[in-house]
A protein has these predicted regions:
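Hydrophobic membrane-insertion alpha-helices, especially the h-region
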Residues: 32-47
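Soluble "head" domains of membrane/secretory-pathway proteins
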Residues: 1-27, 46-52, 57-264
C-alpha cells in the first residue's frame, strides 16, 4: 500500500509530459504560407502586373509572345494627393504605355505615347509631325507597302471603319489639319505603324485608363496570336509549349529591359 501511495504521489509531482502537438506544426506552416501568398498576390496586383503581347502592333519593339512585367506605380494617379508623396513621373512622349482599351476597358492594350495634352499631331505620307516638326522615328516598323490614305495621311476623311471615339476626335479636335490632344488625354500609336489599331481609329487614351509602363520582358516565346488571344490555354498550345519550350523561347529577349524614347 505504501508503495502504491508513493507511486501516486510521484505521478502527481511529476505528471507525464503531454504528447507533441503534431497538428500545430502543419497549421503554423499553412498560416505562414497563406500570409506569404497573400502578400505576393497583393504585391503583384498593386505594384506590378503581368501582360503578354498578343499582336504585332508594336513590332519590332515588342513581339508577339513577349511576356512583360508592367510597373503600375510609374505614373502619378490622376487627381490624387498621393502623387505628391511618392516619386511618380508624368506620362511622356515616347513612353510605351499599357492601358485599358477605351472602346472596351476589359481589354488591355500597349502602344507608344505620341502626344500629350496640348500637342498637335498629323501624319503626311506616314511621317509624323508633332507640333509642326517632323519626327525622326528609328523604332517605327513599316510592314506593308500598300497605301492607305487615312492611315498614312492623318487626319483625313476615313476610308475605313473607325469607332465612335475616333469620329468624335475628328469632329471636335481637328484644328488646321492637325489633331489637338485634349486635357487628361493622350495620343497613342503602335510602332508597327501600318498594322496597328490605335488612336487614329479609336481616339484618345483617357488618363484614367493608363495602367503603367513595361519594365522587363521576363519571358519571350514564339507563339501565335490565336494562342495568346485565347483566355484559356488550348491543348494544342500546351502541347506546343511542352515540345518546343527550349527551341521557341527567345532567349536573347528574355529578361530584356523595356525602354521608352525621347520624342520631341
Amino acid at each position: 500500500v505504501e508503495q502504491k501511495k508513493a507511486a501516486i504521489v510521484a505521478d502527481v509531482k511529476n505528471p507525464p509530459s503531454p504528447p507533441p502537438a503534431k497538428a500545430d506544426l502543419p497549421r503554423g506552416f499553412i498560416a505562414e504560407w497563406t500570409v506569404t501568398i497573400i502578400l505576393l498576390l497583393f504585391g503583384t496586383t498593386t505594384l506590378v502586373q503581368a501582360f503578354v503581347i498578343p499582336t504585332g502592333s508594336m513590332e519590332d519593339t515588342l513581339l508577339i509572345g513577349d511576356h512583360l512585367l508592367v510597373d503600375k506605380l510609374a505614373y502619378a494617379p490622376a487627381g490624387r494627393i498621393s502623387k505628391y508623396l511618392l516619386p511618380y513621373e508624368p506620362v511622356k512622349r515616347g513612353d510605351i504605355i499599357v492601358f485599358r482599351y477605351p472602346v472596351d476597358i476589359r481589354q488591355t492594350f500597349v502602344k507608344r505615347c505620341m502626344g500629350v495634352p496640348g500637342d498637335r499631331i498629323k501624319l503626311v505620307n506616314k511621317e509624323v509631325y508633332l507640333n509642326g516638326k517632323k519626327l525622326v522615328e528609328p523604332y517605327v516598323y513599316h510592314k506593308t507597302e500598300y497605301p492607305d490614305s487615312y492611315r498614312d495621311n492623318f487626319p483625313s476623311d476615313p476610308n475605313v471603319h473607325i469607332y465612335d471615339q475616333g469620329q468624335d476626335m475628328l469632329d471636335h479636335h481637328v484644328v488646321n489639319g492637325e489633331v489637338v490632344v485634349p486635357p487628361d488625354s493622350y495620343f497613342a500609336m503602335g510602332d508597327n505603324r501600318d498594322s496597328s489599331l490605335d488612336s487614329r481609329y479609336w481616339g484618345f487614351v483617357p488618363r484614367a485608363n493608363i495602367i503603367g509602363k513595361p519594365l522587363i520582358i521576363y519571358w519571350s516565346y514564339d507563339a501565335s496570336t490565336e494562342d495568346l488571344s485565347n483566355p484559356t490555354i488550348s491543348v494544342d498550345h500546351l502541347v506546343d509549349l511542352m515540345e518546343h519550350f527550349f527551341t521557341k523561347t527567345r532567349w536573347r529577349r528574355t529578361f530584356m529591359l523595356v525602354h521608352g524614347v525621347n520624342v520631341n
